[in-house]
Amino acid sequence: MALILGIESSCDETAAAVVEDGRRVVSNVVASQIAKHSPYGGVIPELAAREHLTAIGPVVDQALKDAGITPADLSAVAVTHAPGLVPALLIGMTYAKGFAIANDLPLIGINHFLGHIYGAFVGEDAPYKFDDPALYPMLAAVVSGGHTSLVVLTPDGKSHLVGTTLDDAAGEAFDKAAKLLDLGYPGGPIIERLAKNGKTDAHHFPRSLTGAAGKPVAPENRFNFSFSGLKTSLLYLVRDLGGADKLSEEQLYDCLASYQEAIVDVLCTKIFDAAKQYRVKSVVLCGGVACNGALRERFEQRVPKNLIALTAPKKYCTDNAAMIGGLASFYHRSGAYNGLDLDAQARLPLSTELPFSLR
């Protein structure tokens, strides 16, 4: 039995979790900073780092307490080292390194992006294991505030980026729309809640890079995303309706429902076009935006019968440390540890090797 402490601090959640053998989540603690960043309509990196510094110790202590263990019971400590906000990452990494030294534990650096994919496999009730050959090749759709990317994972342990956003990520599109309409932060959950009262076909928003407007899509952009035009279209619509402060409730709800519909439509169209093109056996939907009920419902509706579809549980879609500690079990098994020179990186190539090979 291997108990791994996972630590996550890549953005605005300070999280720690204890995971047993990559599957059983023994404890999972998350300290959110939403209230701190909400007045600014987005995450302020320096503020995030200060909040992490205050929260990291108590959060780790609580994770150990909830698990009913001491550091002596752990097999390793894992920490997100990239990608993310460097000031925020450094807090989690510095703490993890100190914890590893003090308790004579190996250190494992985790790619936050791969961690999100593993969110669909952590938990004893997860229907598949990450290294199940029946799933490969796999298409992972990582949809969050920082990413909107399609990655093909192959049986030889490689991952290949086949699509990404050219401008705003889907989560940013939600946040910026909420800011435009003075709805609050984070925008995704607020828009989802209000959009339930509106008509999805009340307004037509552009579906960029899909060919929906009769414009041919360049081959290199077939699986890429662009949401900046969608945001601009909303800006013009609101202006034409008299401004955000002049919208009736019905107008607001219709705008949001139609806007959300455009995002969901583009995401699902690209996901399943890529799944067909690359002849994958499974598709994984993960990342913070995967909490969106409309997206989850449409994703499940459009899954072809020949595909295995996995959607990460909502509690493992947003940033958490269970996905970090769970994924780390594969590195622990192979002894793939990191030294204390492990560095924080704002960006990391999304085409990277997995911690296992099925060949």
Predicted features and spans:
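Short beta-strand scaffold segments in enzyme catalytic cores
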Residues: 14-19, 140-142, 148-152
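Glycine-rich phosphate-binding loop plus the immediately following alpha-helix
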Residues: 154-199, 231-232, 236-240
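Conserved phosphate-binding/catalytic loops in two-lobed NTP-binding clefts
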Residues: 109-110, 299-324, 338
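Conserved phosphate-binding catalytic cores of ATP/NTP-utilizing and phosphoryl-transfer enzymes
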Residues: 1, 110-138
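N-terminal beta-alpha supersecondary unit
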Residues: 2-73, 79-83
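A contiguous, well-structured pocket-lining segment that forms one wall/lid of small-molecule binding clefts
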Residues: 193-283, 292-307, 332-335, 352-359
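Short glycine-rich phosphate-binding loop at a beta-alpha junction
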Residues: 71-81, 278-289, 310-313
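Short Gly/Thr/Asp-enriched flexible loops that form oxyanion-binding sites at enzyme active sites
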Residues: 79-105, 122-123, 293-302
